[in-house]
Amino acid sequence: MSFSVDVLANIAIELQRGIGHQDRFQRLITTLRQVLECDASALLRYDSRQFIPLAIDGLAKDVLGRRFALEGHPRLEAIARAGDVVRFPADSELPDPYDGLIPGQESLKVHACVGLPLFAGQNLIGALTLDGMQPDQFDVFSDEELRLIAALAAGALSNALLIEQLESQNMLPGDAAPFEAVKQTQMIGLSPGMTQLKKEIEIVAASDLNVLISGETGTGKELVAKAIHEASPRAVNPLVYLNCAALPESVAESELFGHVKGAFTGAISNRSGKFEMADNGTLFLDEIGELSLALQAKLLRVLQYGDIQRVGDDRSLRVDVRVLAATNRDLREEVLAGRFRADLFHRLSVFPLSVPPLRERGDDVILLAGYFCEQCRLRLGLSRVVLSAGARNLLQHYRFPGNVRELEHAIHRAVVLARATRSGDEVILEAQHFAFPEVTLPPPEAAAVPVVKQNLREATEAFQRETIRQALAQNHHNWAACARMLETDVANLHRLAKRLGLKD
């Protein structure tokens, strides 16, 4: 079988139609799955000896949250080391990273697998993976045809990464440095709230403004601080962390500003405080609302004038520190109650960021669950850790008062319980492995009884017609997105729509 010019042109056109990188990547993967007639396809980005999924089709949604470290996935390591198409034999002893992650085929092992490394010049930037349930599924495609596919995908990914690099470095195109993969904190989530937060982080990171990060306990405020620091001009200098809630009043000032020998009982030598340690870098003050009013006044002086005094020393030291502060309190309410200084609040909240709670992040809970499942798999030396449909349903309907931290602990506990109930190194997490209190799953909706008389075929077609109409409306008449939502092949969807009179 050979690709026609029309097929290649269709792939190129789909890449251009996309609005933004993510949409282009998804169009590419969906189109490839149709053209190659595979059961699953994925576009992965390579970063620091791990592959990060950017777009998937035919795989469980939690795959987007997983991070595939090379040391834990020998097939992906083989793809990363290869300079060309990699075909794994059907009887390969190397485990497939997607075993158990193809919906409807969880108990079956993937048989056919092809890996296409993607390069920008000599640099490995990603990979395309193609998987099928039939051993000879990709034999009809020559290596040359697959190289053409890889070239199109590599071009799209390389352009996206270069634009990302230019935006993060705020450079003009003429000043662009050669593409280099830079490891940065991964903030997992595609929900509107997280997408907006990532944009705001990109904006404020390039500045030197102080930032106030608010959010409930367990939402990931420290992760936001790390992301800001790593994307800032201060990234080459230290990020120093201080938990204000864990500071006894007697040592809080010394922790922040340092002390000199003899300043108090037990001060047997000079000691630098967190501000000195963070000089030319960033200081992250977690739970800043716990600081006393006296310390708040001294912190305000540092922010205003840039100098500190060690405890027991009359001399001032100049410091150049960017302050990122976090709180789970409503500091406006604290100001009104007289527990937090208004002037300090205004100094810190020049660019406030709010981290959304997990219950408001929709399907992000499944992506994060996939991330934690992969972490557990590596730590415990398991071949695979997958979520059953029942477990996914439970996670999506639990409200998680402890947010991401609670989800992480719940996944770890569930893996331990599931592992204890079955032999072998494969773990499938079921709903009963989670101990969430007061979880009420929505009852199945009762089917409406038709008022008019219809035979079974007419009723089925009416249901299909209405379902497709609603899906098209929700996806702005994008057929590929509609097919993903309905979990069907887009070509089959087109044929069904024509038969139902929805298309000419």
Curated annotation (Swiss-Prot):
InterPro entries: AAA+_ATPase, GAF, GAF-like_dom_sf, Homeodomain-like_sf, NorR, P-loop_NTPase, Sigma_54_int, Sigma_54_int_dom_ATP-bd_1. This is Anaerobic nitric oxide reductase transcription regulator NorR. Keywords: ATP-binding, DNA-binding, Nucleotide-binding, Phosphoprotein, Transcription, Transcription regulation. Pathway: Nitrogen metabolism; nitric oxide reduction. GO terms for molecular function: ATP binding; ATP hydrolysis activity; DNA binding; DNA-binding transcription factor activity. The modification 4-aspartylphosphate is found at D57. Gene3D superfamilies: 1.10.8.60, 3.30.450.40, Homeodomain-like, P-loop containing nucleotide triphosphate hydrolases. Required for the expression of anaerobic nitric oxide (NO) reductase, acts as a transcriptional activator for at least the norVW operon. Activation also requires sigma-54. One of its GO terms (biological process) is phosphorelay signal transduction system. ATP binds at residues 215-222, 278-287.
